[in-house]
Amino acid sequence: MGETKYIFVTGGVASSLGKGIISSSIGKLLQARGYNVTIQKFDPYINIDPGTLNPYEHGECYVTVDGHEADLDLGHYERFLGIQTTKANNITTGRIYKSVIDKERRGDYLGKTIQVIPHITDEIKRNVKLLGNKYKFDFVITEIGGTVGDIESLPYLESIRQLKWELGKNALCVHLTYVPYLAAAGELKTKPTQHSVKELQSVGIQPDVLVLRAEHPLSDGLRKKVAQFCNVDDKAVVQSIDAETIYEVPLLMQAQGLDSTILEKMGLPVGETPGLGPWRKFLERRHAAETKEPINIALVGKYDLQDAYKSIREALSQAGTYNDRKVEVHFVNSEKLTDENVAEALKGMAGVMIGPGFGQRGIDGKFVAIKYTRTHDIPTFGICLGMQCIAIEFARNVLGYADADSREMDEKTPHNVIDIMEEQKAITNMGGTMRLGAYECVLQKGSKAYLAYGEEHIQERHRHRYEFNNDYKAQYEAAGMKCVGINPESDLVEIVEIPALKWFIGTQFHPEYSSTVLNPHPLFVAFVKAAIENEKN
């Protein structure tokens, strides 16, 4: 195509309007037209990455294949576009400032006074263009976190202003705002959007496209009013009303010609509108699945915020669609789970997920849930800490080591069936120091994991410091828990399963990060299938 085109997505009026979904939808529509697209997220917080952030603060921490702890929006990008993102796809203010300070310490600025303009803004611009320069993408979509008007966003907005001036038609700004509905007046109000656009204009940015988030449809008159007072073309005002599922948003945007408008404004041929056949088939199958009785699956964990397990929820949802059933996820707070109430808490559950996490809080409830599902032969899927809890519960109640534990929870345990990894022992810093990113795993032929994947060699993403202690491996296998997935370099146990049960698997890695709309993860598909079969019985 020639020069890379840059699309900036900003937000106004309120946070959590769905900039990530709009960015992903634009990317999907352009990708369907044959363009090579990637999406990056700029977060205005001063943390280097979200790796040490509490999930209640920021939702789940997503992990890229190259081992970067990233914003959960990267999960949306990957699920929608079916691409793999990297460290370069998620930048924070902390990383920008650290890079500038490191350069200053090296003497790269030759004694100049370091300022927000031009040094910070130049570093932001360099990172915006990095993906386009390095990988030759046709489009780089850049989502700016936060809301226009926030102090933290100002350097990013100034950088966008400069890039729009420098790049001309190769840069475009999409501004997402909120149009509230006042029930008392019975009407939608556009004034907040007008003020948000004026705020953007005050820093020198004229948005090219407006996406209006609303609970009710906008009339043509209302859209024309917004276009007139915000200085954009009529057809460049697009509504984004609430949809049944986020996966319908690309089709809603396409129906209003959003992708055509973007191409036209960037001087590119519009051509025929792509059919998005596989995407539409997925949605048709999803709608058909929703007409049936849902399959109930419990998610046992300590974070009751839905975004804390975002990728797991999406992976379960996708797996349900490909099993032609809607998955109803029931969160079960592990802090409140006891031997006395576990039967009631898991009543009616066709399958149980043991969620990932860190630390002692809520872990005893996970042991209770695992013991119950193991002894009642309920399909169970444990991820990361969930897999470690499966191993600990088995050691306590099957191997007979009542005081078995993880070194993370009890440094003095005499039976450390989960131990800290050797290379982690000398590490003191928390941020970015775990075993992160994609690693190889070899599956045991004939195992349920192997049957799910249909291949022997796989690669999955990790985020952990502790591992299964191979000193106990022979005892586990003799008692009925098999180690069926092994890293060929370190001999680290990646997958355990109990073959005698219907479906009882724990993975040290995070399979949810690799599940996409058009390619659901095989372990999740197999787990949901097992839950459906269990429900029949």
UniProtKB/Swiss-Prot annotation:
- Which residue intervals make up region (Amidoligase domain)? 1-268
| Positions bound to UTP | 15, 189-194, 225
Q: Which residues bind ATP?
A: 16-21, 73
Source organism of this protein record: Bacteroides thetaiotaomicron (strain ATCC 29148 / DSM 2079 / JCM 5827 / CCUG 10774 / NCTC 10582 / VPI-5482 / E50)
Query: Which biological pathway?
Result: Pyrimidine metabolism; CTP biosynthesis via de novo pathway; CTP from UDP: step 2/2
- Give the record's free-text account of how this protein's activity is regulated: Allosterically activated by GTP, when glutamine is the substrate; GTP has no effect on the reaction when ammonia is the substrate. The allosteric effector GTP functions by stabilizing the protein conformation that binds the tetrahedral intermediate(s) formed during glutamine hydrolysis. Inhibited by the product CTP, via allosteric rather than competitive inhibition.
Positions of CTP binding: 15, 150-152, 189-194, 225
Q: Which family does it belong to?
A: Belongs to the CTP synthase family.
Q: Which UniProt keywords apply?
A: ATP-binding, Glutamine amidotransferase, Ligase, Magnesium, Metal-binding, Nucleotide-binding, Pyrimidine biosynthesis
Binding positions for Mg(2+)? Answer: 73, 143
User: Its function?
Assistant: Catalyzes the ATP-dependent amination of UTP to CTP with either L-glutamine or ammonia as the source of nitrogen. Regulates intracellular CTP levels through interactions with the four ribonucleotide triphosphates.
Per UniProt, residues of the Glutamine amidotransferase type-1 domain are 296-537
What more the UniProt record tells us is: CTPSs have evolved a hybrid strategy for distinguishing between UTP and CTP. The overlapping regions of the product feedback inhibitory and substrate sites recognize a common feature in both compounds, the triphosphate moiety. To differentiate isosteric substrate and product pyrimidine rings, an additional pocket far from the expected kinase/ligase catalytic site, specifically recognizes the cytosine and ribose portions of the product inhibitor.
GO terms of molecular function: ATP binding; CTP synthase activity; glutaminase activity; identical protein binding; metal ion binding
What binding partners and quaternary form does the record give? Homotetramer.
Question: What is the name of the protein in this document?
Answer: CTP synthase
At the highest ranks, the source species' classification is: Bacteria, Pseudomonadati, Bacteroidota, Bacteroidia, Bacteroidales
Which GO biological process annotations does it have? 'de novo' CTP biosynthetic process; CTP biosynthetic process; pyrimidine nucleobase biosynthetic process
Tagged with keyword Metal-binding? yes
Q: Which residues act catalytically here?
A: 384, 510, 512
Chain positions recorded as L-glutamine binding sites: 56, 357, 385-388, 408, 465
Q: Does the keyword Metal-binding apply?
A: yes
What reaction(s) does this enzyme catalyze?
A: UTP + L-glutamine + ATP + H2O = CTP + L-glutamate + ADP + phosphate + 2 H(+); L-glutamine + H2O = L-glutamate + NH4(+); UTP + NH4(+) + ATP = CTP + ADP + phosphate + 2 H(+)
InterPro entries, sorted: Class_I_gatase-like, CTP_synthase, CTP_synthase_N, GATASE, GATase1_CTP_Synthase, P-loop_NTPase
